[in-house]
Design a protein with these regions (language model features):
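Core segments of cupin and vicinal oxygen chelate
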Residues: 1-38
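Short beta-strand/turn micro-motifs at beta-sheet edges
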Residues: 45-48
């Protein structure tokens, strides 16, 4: 838990650690209440608890390629890359790193351009905005 909190505080510009519960002052954090980009989470250090899986992912809707690149590199450095903007961090948490500009391409009223963007997206790991243009 402590390593994850340190990683998230370094990675996400809008990370806020709100409270922690350390039953043993010299031990590991048992629970933590934190927010990432204003979304609240409670994490628990539960040895032997259920493992993370891809059925739940946290979506990061970011502005611009530079922010996509920064987050993608940080998350996948010790994690793993998936398809269509999905990746998993070193702690097993699944993320979707999506530029807000992607939606305008996928929802383009010109159906040919929208389909081009969709087909391009299906071939990507990290999303590259410029490659969504027809």
């Amino acid at each position: 838990m402590d390593d994850a909190l340190a990683f998230y505080s370094e990675t996400f510009e809008r990370f806020e650690l709100r409270s922690t519960n350390k039953p043993d002052p010299n031990g590991a954090t048992f629970t933590a209440d934190f927010a990432i980009y204003g979304h609240e989470f409670i994490g628990m250090n539960w040895p032997g608890g259920p493992a993370f899986n891809d059925s739940i992912s946290l979506s990061l809707n970011v502005d611009g390629q530079e922010e996509v690149d920064r987050l993608w590199e940080a998350i996948t450095a010790r994690g793993k890359a998936g398809r269509c903007g999905w990746c998993v961090d070193e702690f097993g948490v699944s993320w979707q790193v999506s530029p807000i500009q992607m939606r305008e391409h996928l929802e383009n009223p010109d159906r040919e351009k929208a389909e081009y963007a969709n087909q391009a997206l299906m071939k990507m790991s990290k999303i590259v905005i410029d490659e969504l243009y027809a």
